[in-house]
């Protein structure tokens, strides 16, 4: 018998901007439990973004994240021996999680010297609708569009 879903954990807002989305981002950025280092990297990256763009670094970061959030994704479903990719709408929580993970994944693959610079330049690129994280979202949407014929299947 199922016991129901676990309680949602509440996140504390970050110390500088008082924003829980920043905390989520930093928690994904963190490696090996080194949260202070993750905060330092994030705040430095936001400062670099602010210097390069001349706008508020946090606002540019939020715009970049919203450009990376996917609205549809594909899930595999087996139908009569064939595996179909069925497009489904992404839940809001998962949308945020995917966007954050994609942005960090692509920032880590960039060629700049420090993580602060990599993250900053990925944020700037994503805020302008460019960059690999935005391309990943576009690829996901393209995949969902090309498999639209299977959207009537239930997952």
Curated annotation (Swiss-Prot):
GO terms for molecular function: rRNA binding; structural constituent of ribosome; tRNA binding. It holds the Pfam family Ribosomal_S7. It comes from Amoebophilus asiaticus (strain 5a2). It comes from the Bacteria. One of the primary rRNA binding proteins, it binds directly to 16S rRNA where it nucleates assembly of the head domain of the 30S subunit. Is located at the subunit interface close to the decoding center, probably blocks exit of the E-site tRNA. Keywords: Ribonucleoprotein, Ribosomal protein, RNA-binding, rRNA-binding, tRNA-binding. One of its GO terms (cellular component) is small ribosomal subunit. NCBIfam families: rpsG_bact (TIGR01029). The keyword Calcium does not apply. Transmembrane segments: none annotated. This is Small ribosomal subunit protein uS7. InterPro entries: Ribosomal_uS7, Ribosomal_uS7_bac/org-type, Ribosomal_uS7_CS, Ribosomal_uS7_dom, Ribosomal_uS7_dom_sf. Belongs to the universal ribosomal protein uS7 family. Part of the 30S ribosomal subunit. Contacts proteins S9 and S11. One of its GO terms (biological process) is translation.
